[in-house]
Amino acid sequence: MRLENTILRQLVTNEEFTRRALPFIKKEYFADHIERQVFSEIEAFLLKYNNLPSLESLVIDLNNKKGMSEDLFRGSVEAINKLFEPQETVNQDWLMEETENWCQSKAIYNSIMESINIYDGKSKEMDRGAIPKLLSDALAVSFDSKVGHDYVEDWEDRFDFYHKKEFKIPFDLEYMNKIT
């Protein structure tokens, strides 16, 4: 079983995982064109209806797509059917950790490949100056959504930090000892 299949399955069956992981997963991370198409359908449904999709809704939406090859359509329908087959439960913490590592790995891989194309002159949109930005964006992929302090929930840690006695290095000047 591939991690990509587990991620796609959890996106349609596990609401907590979907809410936490979907903002960080991009369709470019899926190498297989069928998995990429299935993810696009799942993502479109979730963004439009803010609810987990059903098997029927995904297949109908896929059927309404125009310009899709027959092989891609058949493969996508087969993959969607497999997503809804009963499976054993997956540990949530393990799943989040593995998904974060997978996203980081894919982001770095994609940025390195794009950097090689830029360096070789195959990219018309970007010049070589964009390579550091691509790589830094890829290295910044993280599921940690905490920014700064939460003044209500972190009050104990903040109180301890403010009242912690620090080891001080004594100065020869008494005035410097008072202000530090």
Where are these regions (language model features)?
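The Walker A/P-loop phosphate-binding site
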Residues: 9, 141-180
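Noncatalytic partner-interaction/assembly domains of nucleic-acid and motor enzyme complexes
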Residues: 1-102
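Short amphipathic alpha-helical segments, especially helix-boundary/capping motifs
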Residues: 13-19, 34-36, 87-92, 107-109, ...
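Short coil/turn segments at secondary-structure boundaries
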Residues: 19-24, 54-58, 75, 94, ...
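Interdomain "pre-motor" coupling segment immediately N-terminal to P-loop NTPase/helicase cores
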Residues: 85-151
